[in-house]
A protein has these predicted regions:
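Conserved active-site "lid/cap" helical segment
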Residues: 38-130, 138, 193-200, 222-223, ...
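Conserved catalytic cysteine-centered active-site region
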Residues: 42-46, 59, 96-154, 158-185, ...
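Short glycine/threonine-rich loop-to-helix capping motif typified by GTGT followed
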Residues: 99-107, 288-292, 325-349, 360, ...
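Beta-strand segments within the central parallel beta-sheet cores of soluble alpha/beta enzyme folds
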Residues: 86-96, 121-127, 151-155, 202-209, ...
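Long, intrinsically disordered low-complexity tandem-repeat segments
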Residues: 2-39
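Acyl-CoA/ACP chain-elongation machinery
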Residues: 155-156, 161-163, 167, 208, ...
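Active-site-proximal alpha-helical scaffold in enzymes
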Residues: 126-157, 183-217, 258-264, 374-395
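Condensing-enzyme catalytic core mediating Claisen C-C bond formation in acyl metabolism
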Residues: 35-68, 205-207, 238-305, 353-367, ...
Length: 430
């Protein structure tokens, strides 16, 4: 996974050369070198609200539209949700996964007009599979730093244009031999978790069965398997031991967009805003001596920073819903531990006992998650947007009753890039 263009936590709030229509000089442009990482107190930042959310209906192939048409569809829906027009947007931040997924290099060169960015700042973010989350955080930091007041952020993937399996089967010296796709890379880490935690081999099937049932309640989800059963999941072919076919994410075409704005913009919004209480990014190398692929340190650090910003001391009790990046079903229990919802070796017990069900104590992926919808570049932003929908009370049939705080989570590369935000139904205090 290429880290080129990855936006560091210290750099996300400082868009080089991006001049706001309100003017970059003075206090609106004074982001400070540490503004993006949440190192400053909330009192020094502008509160950020999500006031518009739009998605395409995700499918295996959108042959009816170009990439430009796909992204404009999501952007238009986000603007309509916010009841804003293109002229209300000060800047555009877009993201997608590696270009070989479509075979179109630097597609952002062709998207300024489709996204209403002509004459305005537009930038692209790239942090592999976590890019959808990172892109939203860069946009959020532009508002928090008072560089821009209202920002359109969007992430997308049109995987039908190329072959993701081929693209992810990298040759030596970039990857070990005999790997096929992302599953070939992650399967040994799943096996290591099972051995370390003493988890029964049925847990992955439970996650897949749950998420596919949740997806039936989400009209935007790619996979709508009305005949899904636990037995069907368990009988599906083994692709990368211990990962079965039905425990694997699909390849999707789709886009997701959000409109982020400041306190004044939120006050004018016809929709209930989702307020950003904390957001962070962390990274680490793909390979290094002592790396823990089962529970990467970067993921732990990223979650800890978000919780600190949001004043969360007990995530298991204080967070009402989690949209977690789970491309292979076993990553639900693994990330439950990595994010502090369960002690080491205990995550699978939450899954097995039904805690993560839609009606459980800690619903995980009520939307159906990445296991049901996976336009890779947009998958992380969908997690963030779905978390925002939960606290707005607008998630439809997959709404978690009484959700007040929700976590959006994304990871990418060789479990090396992490991005997360926590949103709430009320403005942050302080």
């Amino acid at each position: 996974m290429s880290p080129q263009g990855a936006v560091s936590p210290q750099g996300a709030a400082s868009p080089q050369g991006a001049v706001s229509r309100q003017g970059a000089a003075g206090p609106r442009g004074a982001a400070g070198p540490q503004g993006a990482a949440g190192s400053r107190s909330a009192a020094h930042k502008e509160p950020v609200a999500v006031v518009g959310i739009g998605q395409t209906h995700h499918v295996a192939a959108r042959h009816d539209v170009s990439i430009a048409g796909l992204v404009r569809e999501a952007a238009r829906r986000a603007l309509d949700d916010a009841q804003l027009t293109w002229s209300d947007i000060d800047a555009v931040v877009i993201g997608k996964a590696p270009d070989f997924f479509e075979g179109v290099m630097m597609p952002e060169l062709y998207l300024a007009d489709a996204l209403g960015a002509v004459g305005k700042p537009m930038m692209r973010v790239h942090t592999a599979g976590s890019v959808g989350g990172s892109t939203a955080l860069v946009a959020s930091n532009l508002v928090a730093a008072r560089v821009h007041r209202t920002v359109l952020t969007l992430a997308f993937e049109k995987q039908s244009e190329s072959n993701a399996m081929w693209g992810l089967s990298l040759p030596v010296p970039f990857q070990q031999p005999l790997l096929a796709g992302a599953g070939g890379f992650f399967a040994p880490h799943v096996r290591a978790y099972m051995r370390r935690a003493g988890a029964p081999d049925t847990v992955g099937s439970l996650v897949a069965y749950k998420d596919r049932r949740n997806a039936l309640k989400n009209p935007y989800a790619h996979l709508h398997e009305k005949d899904i059963t636990l037995e069907k999941v368990q009988a599906s072919p083994m692709l990368w031991d211990p990962i079965r076919y039905s425990e694997t994410c699909p390849s999707s075409d789709g886009a997701c967009a959000m409109v982020l704005t400041d306190r004044a913009g939120a006050a004018r919004s016809p929709q209930p805003p989702a307020w950003v209480h904390g957001g962070a990014m962390r990274s680490e190398p793909t390979l290094f001596a002592g790396k823990d692929f089962v529970s990467p340190q970067a993921g732990k650090d990223c979650a800890a920073d978000v919780y600190r910003q949001a004043g969360i001391t007990d995530p298991r009790r204080e967070i009402d819903a989690v949209e977690m990046y789970v491309p292979f079903s076993w990553y639900e229990p693994m990330w439950l531990e990595n994010l502090g919802f369960a002690a080491e070796g205990e995550g699978w017990k939450l899954t097995e006992s039904g805690v993560t069900e839609l009606d459980g104590d800690l619903p995980v992926n009520p939307s159906g998650g990445v296991l049901s919808t996976n336009p890779i570049g947009a998958s992380g932003m969908i997690r963030f947007a779905e978390a925002a929908l939960q606290v707005r009370g607008q998630a439809g049939e997959h709404q978690v009753d009484g959700a007040r705080k929700a976590l959006g989570h994304a990871y990418g590369g060789g479990s090396q890039f992490f991005s997360m935000w926590l949103v709430g139904s009320e403005p942050p205090t302080g």
